[in-house]
């Protein structure tokens, strides 16, 4: 018998135009490929703590939501601790539903300063130029967030930092896709 995906039997679905992701239910297990080891992508708990704070301020009980996405109370105690990236995605998408805010991911990113990003924020703020800051984010983002890839693109005098979920099944979810954008718009501009 395979262990349950999450501690809770409650389920909710995250939708995007081309798929439905369901958390909290027994998944259809496929035979292992290769050695059968599955790598769980991790992220610092920092942004999950910000989301939990938003839910508390709005009067939502956190225990049920935490269990639905597979998080324990201790997972949200230290911003430097690591949680599963899929649980973080579940939390931000669930928060958007509970807060009835279709732009929650965007607002979450815009409501925090670059300094609220821990190591990545420190690197960005201590880079001599915006170009250097974005290059450093591309280089080091996986240290704090294994769930996204960053690509720094240069075109003439312009440049952009593009994020993409490492796990293809999570790509395109609305709130996770929009959160990183505004938080880097405040990086050093010289």
What are these regions (language model features)?
Residues 3-162, 176, 180-183:
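N-terminal low-complexity or simple alpha-helical regulatory segments
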Residues 164-168:
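Conserved short histidine dyad/triad with adjacent acidic residue
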Residues 170-190:
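Core beta-strand-centered patch of the WYL/Sm-like small regulatory domain
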